[in-house]
Swiss-Prot record:
Mn(2+) 2 binds at residues 16, 86, 108, 160. It comes from the Archaea. Binds 2 manganese ions per subunit. It is found in: Cytoplasm. SMART domains: DHHA2. The gene is ppaC. Its cofactor is Mn(2+). This is Probable manganese-dependent inorganic pyrophosphatase. One of its GO terms (molecular function) is manganese ion binding.
Length: 322
């Protein structure tokens, strides 16, 4: 087994999964030099951040702004030591995970189905962003946060919490963001957040499938394969002319992939709501989950900003009741 720990986020990487991998790899290597963590675990392998796919324009912008290279792509973990950030589900992790050695998991989602034969470093907190958890690990273990790392951690929080508008946002996320902003030299969090999110609103050069897959995850919902994607926009008018094209691509994806349903969240950051595009064999799950009957291709969900907290749980419950 290689003497390297590959720190990796989920498939279809977003800003939090990429930047958290970079920041946690940096932190791990600081732990390797000594300090409090050595009292708990022996660290011999050097950490290296990797990603499972191409970065989106928002992440690319953040990395360039704070002087980081895009990490290498690694999709198979067989025979490798890996640390998982921003996920703990097999469907979202590297191939060959059962033949990898998982040495750490740092996350903010529900606990997934990745298991280990021995105890590991496992930190999972109910906050809005994995970057928030990593910042706390820096503090708890007495490692100073450099300006560039502070910048990407802050960007991750603003991205994942949708500038603190997402239902997943906690007061701790806001406090941590303020502390990181001071280190990174960012004065106006809202302005910087809009600057970041605007990069994801550029969809003209994307294919319909690119839009669906930009921030997309597969789920097993009571034995049924369900996909939920999300694209965040500063204005839904930017994508209105593409709806029919996207819908047809979703139908094709559903048929070819054996899905019970594919749901695409078109989230309007400024209006604070989501137009949910739906292709499913079970249209009744929409009413069960959200209290609104599906008429046509989509349904508007006022105040819905978070896939993790406001879309996936009610869908899981609805599919379980079929």
């Amino acid at each position: 087994m290689e003497h390297v720990v590959y720190v990796v986020g989920h498939k279809n990487p977003d800003t939090d999964s990429v930047c958290s991998a970079i920041a946690f790899a940096y932190l791990w290597n600081k732990w390797k030099e000594g300090g409090n963590v050595a009292k708990m675990m022996k660290i011999e392998a050097e950490a290296k951040p990797v990603i499972q796919g191409d970065v989106n324009p928002e992440t690319k912008y953040v990395l360039e702004k704070f002087g980081f290279e895009v990490p290498e792509i690694m999709t198979n973990g067989e025979g490798k030591k890996v640390a998982l950030v921003d996920h703990s589900e097999k469907a979202q992790t590297v191939d060959g995970i059962d033949k990898a050695e998982v040495v750490a998991i740092v996350d903010h989602h529900k606990i997934g189905d990745v298991t280990t034969p021995q105890p590991i470093l496992f930190v999972n907190l109910p906050v809005g962003c994995t970057a928030t958890v990593i910042k706390l690990l820096f503090d708890k273990t007495g490692v100073e946060i450099p300006k560039d790392i502070a910048g990407i951690l802050l960007s991750s929080i603003l991205s994942d919490t949708v500038i603190f508008k997402s239902a997943t946002t906690t007061e701790l996320d806001k406090e941590v963001a303020e502390e990181l902003a001071k280190i990174a030299g960012i004065d106006d969090l809202t302005k910087f957040g809009v600057e970041i999110k605007a990069k994801l609103s550029a969809v003209d050069d994307l294919t319909a499938m690119d839009i669906i897959k930009r921030d997309y995850k597969d789920f097993d919902m009571s034995g049924k394969k369900v996909g939920v994607g999300q694209i965040e926009l500063v204005d839904l008018s930017l994508i209105e002319s593409r709806i029919d094209e996207i819908y047809e691509a979703m139908k094709k994806m559903k048929e070819e992939g054996g899905y019970a349903g594919i749901f695409l969240m078109l989230t309007d950051i400024m209006k604070e709501g989501t137009e949910l595009l739906v292709v499913t064999d079970y249209p009744e799950v929409v009413e069960k989950a959200f209290g609104k009957k599906l008429e046509g291709k989509s349904v508007w969900l006022d105040g819905v900003m978070s896939r993790k907290k406001q879309v996936v749980p009610p869908l899981e419950k609805a599919f379980a009741e079929l």
